[in-house]
Amino acid sequence: MTLLDAPKFDAAREQRRQVFLYSTAGFLFVLLVVWWLVAGRPVDWPWNWNNYLFGRSVVNNFLSDVEKNDLASAYGIWIHDKNWQQHPAQYGAYPFARFQEDWSSTSPDNEYGAIQTHKIALAGRYGNGVLLAVLINGRKSKALNLEYDPKNHSLNFAPPGVELYLGP
């Protein structure tokens, strides 16, 4: 056999190779579509989809604790520190007493009353974070806008004047 002699063409091997490549490409495409659906169908680059997914999860956990009136646990989610009670002085900018005034069902500052249900209506990028519009107690308008910071996994109120448009 010389250097210029080509090996015999193996049709079965070529067919297996093509089936493998097309199957792999199809599987990766299906995986990408499922990831996009689970992340909430964000209109953003794929490398940001996990931020939407984690932001929705954190907001759902936070509001579930508020619905159960477990404000201590909800505050831990808000500041992303489960053991916040061991060092409360570290969170002097937004202390637990002020958090209770904002989120308690009997608080005069809580314009939604006792929070019983919630639904994330929309999520979008804002700066480095994810802005989430949440409809409280079955409302169709006047959503609660929360910002999720993917760097430190904490929640915050949306900046003044910044809210997601839910339509007419």
Model-based region annotation:
Residues V66, W103, S107, N152-N156:
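Hydrophobic, Leu/Ile/Phe/Ala-enriched alpha-helical segments that form helix-helix packing faces
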Residues S57, N61, A72-N137:
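Short solvent-exposed beta->alpha transition segments
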Residues K8-E14, Q18-L21, L135-P168:
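Short beta-strand edge/turn micro-motifs at domain boundaries
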